[in-house]
């Protein structure tokens, strides 16, 4: 079974380097895996200002963040392949990659995988949940050819 992914990528940033649409599709498809037969996903790449506004509005944190996940929640009687939206702040991803001594590509891949797992219901609030999510993220990221995103540099 392979995933039929309808991916909408929105560029709302002036960042110098962004992954290709093909990279975004590969990373999202890898994260979603066999969880769904088909999925519709929007990835919106934003600047710090938009990220800060959304983070403040939806999480009560008045600062930009790397990735926000907005799962689509349909009524139980309606079956739609809408997975949800990811909003990724290019400037935060770039800064974190530099601080963590990772390549931009590796950190972008991690943010897409991380965000997609949130859309699938994974979380990292409780220690046990965090352990499960981080383990799956590491497995997926390493499967894409990158190093463990949680390994100390």
Swiss-Prot record:
Entry-linked InterPro entries: MetalPrtase_cat_dom_sf_prd (IPR023091), YbeY (IPR002036), YbeY_CS (IPR020549)
One Gene Ontology cellular component annotation held by this UniProt entry: cytoplasm
Top-level EC class: hydrolase
Essential cofactor(s): Zn(2+)
Record carries keyword rRNA processing: yes
Pfam families: YbeY
HAMAP family for the chain: Endoribonucl_YbeY (MF_00009)
Family: Belongs to the endoribonuclease YbeY family.
Name the record gives this protein: Endoribonuclease YbeY
Species per Swiss-Prot/TrEMBL record: Shewanella baltica (strain OS223)
Gene assigned in the entry: ybeY
